[in-house]
Amino acid sequence: MQNFKHICVIGLGYIGLPTAATFAAHGVKVTGVDVNQHAVDLINQGKVHIVEPDLDALVRDVVAQGKLSAQIIPIEADAYIVAVPTPFKDDYQPDLKYIEAAAKAIAPYLSQDNLVILESTSPVGATEQMAAWLSEARPDLTFPQQAGEQADILIAHCPERVLPGKVLQELISNDRIVGGMTPRCSQASIDLYKVFVKGDCIETNARTAEMCKLTENSFRDVNIAFANELSIICDKLDINVWELIKLANRHPRVNILQPGPGVGGHCIAVDPWFIVSKTPEQARLIRTAREVNDAKPEWVIDQVKIKIAEFLQANPEKTIKDVTVACYGLAFKPDIDDLRESPALEITKKLAEQGINILAIEPNIKTLPQKLPNNVQLTDVEAGLEADIYVVLVKHKQFKNLCLNIKKVIDMCGV
């Protein structure tokens, strides 16, 4: 069993920082690395730059204990965990530039028997590509693609499987898929994660581990697309979709998900494209689901325009510049501050670009993203009640008991 006294986590975002803090809380010395100097400075003060329940207290404690520190360049360690973004390009092809940068950053510090784990959700083959970049940078060391079980450096893929808002609990309780490039790589990775993981660590190969995470999120995306398409059909047929789903789900083998304004975040809205990019002819259902979910924000915008037209018809003395729309929620899901790929943010931006005055109610952020026009004002729940039209885009807990005029509401999440 391999002993890991010091690990280095590359990328201190929504996955990297909780992972680093959890290892530190279980007695491992952790050095976190991030290119964001502001984030590094905050962490070293025992503070956090992201919203995740209980993370602030955990980071404060492990920094105070000297178990966690942060810096902008890597350091020699026993193991490296890469948790950097993996976006896609404009043509929906995966962009591995952050993985490449991480590989080149850690390469000078590698030594015999080091373990490198790619946690970033990645297209099939990304772990092998990372190994190739490392090998190119360190020809003095051997890697699994060259030396198999006798390699100097061990490499694996272990995708995160946590739910934002419950990250700290699920890091410990969830099962982990561990895909080494060789069985020895897998076993070393299991030894590392068993420092804190109480769920099962299930061994496979790197390519299957990569595809497993993509499959999980594509399954979710396809099922959400069904719910979103159903909501559009029900609107056309004048049927309450929330009541319909509740009734249909009373069938013992039916479990329809809840519709929404689209699909956001850096996983479900992105990962299916990694499958489509590799197998475009075969992934027809997965592509169609992505198209359905990507189109939902435009449908929401059309519903708002209809509501605005009705308002102006009832108030002929006013123009569109006199209309105020309250958008409740900007995050991609409830009770977090993550705006990545958020359909709510996209809807708010496009409505503002129509010249409509927007009141944005997002209790989990302090400032608006720069991409929003100047006619968007960040305000609180009470101030939003002064709007002419309400659009509920995210099911934040603060919106649970909203008392809104039903004639003025477009409810996209069943609040």
Model-derived regions, located:
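Structural/interface elements that position substrates and couple domains in central-metabolism enzymes
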Residues: 1-415
